[in-house]
Amino acid sequence: IPEFNTRFTRQMLVDTQPKDFNTLLRLSGFSHGTDVWLGNAKDLIVSGTASVLETVGCRDDIMLYLISMGLDPKMSFKIMEAVRKGKVKGGKAGDWPMWVEEMRKHDVPEWYIESLAKIGYLFPKAHAVAYVMMAFRIAWFKVHEPLAFYATFFSIRAKAFDAAECCKDADALRRRIREIENNKDATAVEQDLMTTLEVCYEFCLRGFHFEPIDIYRSDATKFVVTENGLLPPFTSVRGLGETAALDTVEKRKGKDFTSVEEFSLCCNKLSQTHIDQLRALGAFAG
């Protein structure tokens, strides 16, 4: 789900257990801000010092909270602006001592004042609302139209999808994920692959599966929804680019190949390596 798909944001969901839209907005602010979550709001929430909705997630939270505590609206705005730009943290807000005194006069908790002083950058709530609304809509499809969701995700977002690595059962996927996790020297390519493998693992746990690539039915670049799963495209074969995939789909039209060699001669933008990989993936079984 966009906004909440990295390990960092998924752990944030585990730590906060959100139950309403407003909390999701705070989490969006936490993840897009600088020095807002780690070493700041997370510690306050985990320790029980404050709830998610009491901490600072977005710029607007500061001004609205300070006004609700009785501070002058203009001063509340100035504090918000200084904090969200990192001026307080950087020691460039000359009025900060006076503002602190004023906040204490209005019973603003010390933990809140200390939290403000740690912030380097704050996200605007309007942007958080737009992002979370988008994520919420996509989450609906993930729950209620899962195959449409996964087909779109793998077609557009999963650039690291490798049929040889990803089209396996749940146990094999889990082992591969652990293998990459435990490899301190894992490459950037392997890290990207692991993110895709995690979604494939989830896909399998939900009772779906990947069908073998089919030289007659597979699309060039998009995953096709089938009765119980997805049919991977030609571009999911390692090293097989979009140009060769589109050429293959065009040249197979109206054909009924009698051998692998005939297919290879017809679809001549595919290398022998591609043909061998397609054979290993069961693409010629039909």
Which residues does each predicted region cover?
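Noncatalytic, beta-rich nucleic-acid-contacting surfaces in large DNA/RNA-processing enzymes
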Residues: 1-286
